[in-house]
UniProtKB/Swiss-Prot annotation:
EC number: 1.14.19.-
Keyword Phosphoprotein: no
Species assigned in the record: Homo sapiens
Note: A 28 kDa isoform is expressed in lung, kidney, pancreas and ovary (at protein level).
Main function: Mammals have different sphingoid bases that differ in their length and/or pattern of desaturation and hydroxyl groups. The predominant sphingoid base that comprises mammalian ceramides is sphing-4-enine (sphingosine or SPH) which has a trans (E) desaturation at carbon 4. FADS3 is a desaturase that introduces a cis (Z) double bond between carbon 14 and carbon 15 of the sphingoid base (also known as long chain base, LCB), producing LCBs such as sphinga-4,14-dienine (SPD, d18:2(4E,14Z)) from SPH. Prefers SPH-containing ceramides (N-acylsphing-4-enines) as substrates.
Ranges for region Disordered: 1-21
Short motif Histidine box-3, span: 383-387
Catalysed conversion reaction: an N-acylsphing-4-enine + 2 Fe(II)-[cytochrome b5] + O2 + 2 H(+) = an N-acyl-sphinga-4E,14Z-dienine + 2 Fe(III)-[cytochrome b5] + 2 H2O; N-(hexanoyl)sphing-4-enine + 2 Fe(II)-[cytochrome b5] + O2 + 2 H(+) = N-hexanoyl-sphinga-4E,14Z-dienine + 2 Fe(III)-[cytochrome b5] + 2 H2O; sphing-4-enine + 2 Fe(II)-[cytochrome b5] + O2 + 2 H(+) = sphinga-4E,14Z-dienine + 2 Fe(III)-[cytochrome b5] + 2 H2O; (11E)-octadecenoyl-CoA + 2 Fe(II)-[cytochrome b5] + O2 + 2 H(+) = (11E,13Z)-octadecadienoyl-CoA + 2 Fe(III)-[cytochrome b5] + 2 H2O
UniProt keyword annotations, A-Z: Electron transport, Endoplasmic reticulum, Fatty acid biosynthesis, Fatty acid metabolism, Lipid biosynthesis, Lipid metabolism, Membrane, Oxidoreductase, Transmembrane, Transmembrane helix, Transport
Annotated compartments: Endoplasmic reticulum membrane
Protein name from the UniProt record: Fatty acid desaturase 3
Record-level GO cellular component terms: endoplasmic reticulum membrane; membrane
Length: 445
């Protein structure tokens, strides 16, 4: 093994049949810079520096695991591991030295081992196999609501009451479409990735007017590094809102771009109403243009063409624009409350390089299940199970939950489950707490 701090081989991948060079973690830690990234998977060391831009999930996603053991993330995100390993082989430059632990940083080796055994048990129980009937029903009820909304206006006219009912129904349809495209993005429905990708483009593009690539770019980072600043886009929201550790940091630096001690109040004005209508619409369009996602742009255009051609004859241009805004605002409320109730009240801060299980549990909690909550949240009330097993079809979360709860009990880890309304209120409480922490640091530190 080379001396500590030596950069290791850079001339190319390990030669087939030749003994693999060995590395210690101190050497690997030196390779977590832009343009110089190593990572470890199954104790093998890979140089992804030049290949990261070709990574299907994006260079940021794989780069977030620089100089880390990415074994559990690798297994969590990919369907066909043997197929993906073919792409890793040319990047192989060595392996961990025998005396090195499998993971750098805070590590509970027994927890990692037990989780991998649990993952295998879930596979043996066929919990990664989707129910075609379940997902066909989901798509069917989305399409039925789209038709029902149009029929209301067609049969009853564009009065205030039919329009309000139609907007409400379309908002539900849009919310459920978020859930279905989310399932497809995680490749949890079809056995072949290609079919998941194609179906996601249809649901995200034709039914919602957004880019599947854009969603996956954001969402996979969130799953890889939940609640980690500058790695999880969902919590990198300063200077509009301050969350977790950013509250103290902004306070100490005397930054006051907004009255953060009142952020739990202005959240109701610019959070739930405007996220989808303003932030997502602008960010999504910019992503498609900058990243030249022309196919996604065409899919999104097909949604707008269908929507406006369907309702323009009833409302005219000003009316159909107002109707569209109403649907987006209603949908946005659903999206914010449902997606944030499991994360915002949890630990939010900078990278701590934890193992997969510990990092996911620190950032997530569950909400008590019921038929309504399961449907309304797209089963995101089982957020712990979803984050540990992102490819698992959501109808199987309840089956794996007792096993996850037992794992947490064995290792003294928190398995938090809240009532639905408590989870919603905790979002506001968390924002107020962060604002108060900012104010105290601003005035006294």
């Amino acid at each position: 093994m080379g001396g500590v701090g030596e950069p290791g081989p850079r001339e190319g991948p390990a030669q087939p049949g030749a003994p693999l060079p060995t590395f210690c973690w101190e050497q690997i830690r030196a390779h977590d810079q832009p343009g110089d990234k190593w990572l470890v998977i199954e104790r093998r060391v890979y140089d992804i520096s030049r290949w990261a831009q070709r990574h299907p999930g994006g260079s940021r996603l794989i780069g977030h695991h620089g100089a880390e053991d990415a074994t559990d993330a690798f297994r969590a995100f990919h369907q066909d591991l043997n197929f993906v390993r073919k792409f890793l082989q040319p990047l192989l430059i060595g392996e961990l030295a025998p005396e090195e632990p499998s993971q750098d940083g805070p590590l509970n080796a027994q927890l990692v081992e037990d989780f991998r055994a649990l993952h295998q048990a879930a596979e043996d129980m066929k919990l990664f196999d989707a129910s075609p009937t379940f997902f066909a029903f989901l798509l069917g009820h989305i399409l039925a609501m789209e038709v029902l909304a149009w029929l209301l206006i067609y049969l009853l006219g564009p009065g205030w009451v039919p329009s309000a009912l139609a907007a409400f129904i379309l908002a539900i349809s849009q919310a459920q479409s978020w859930c279905l495209q989310h399932d497809l993005g995680h490749a949890s429905i079809f056995k072949k990735s290609w079919w998941n990708h194609v179906a996601q483009k249809f649901v995200m593009g034709q039914l919602k007017g957004f880019s599947a690539h854009w969603w996956n770019f954001r969402h996979f980072q969130h799953h890889a590094k939940p609640n980690i600043f500058h790695k999880d886009p969902d919590v990198t929201v300063a200077p509009v809102f301050l969350l977790g550790e950013s509250s103290v940091e902004y306070g100490k630096k005397k930054r006051r771009y907004l009255p953060y001690n009142q952020q739990h109040l202005y959240f109701f004005l610019i959070g739930p109403p405007l996220l989808t209508l303003v932030n997502f619409e602008v960010e999504n369009l910019a992503y498609m243009l900058v990243c030249m996602q022309w196919a996604d742009l065409l899919w999104a255009a097909s949604f707008y063409a269908r929507f406006f051609l369907s309702y323009l004859p009833f409302y005219g241009v000003p009316g159909v624009l107002l109707f569209f805004v109403a649907v987006r605002v209603l949908e946005s409320h659903w999206f914010v409350w449902i997606t944030q109730m499991n994360h915002i009240p949890k630990e939010i801060g900078h990278e701590k390089h934890r193992d997969w299980v510990s990092s996911q549990l620190a950032a997530t909690c569950n909400v008590e299940p019921s038929l309504f909550t399961n449907w309304f949240s797209g089963h995101l009330n089982f957020q712990i199970e979803h984050h540990l097993f992102p490819r698992m079809p959501r109808h199987n979360y309840s089956r794996v939950a007792p096993l996850v709860k037992s794992l947490c009990a064995k290792h003294g880890l928190s398995y938090e489950v809240k009532p639905f309304l408590t989870a919603l209120v905790d979002i506001v409480r968390s924002l107020k707490k962060s604002g108060d922490i900012w104010l105290d640091a601003y005035l006294h530190q």
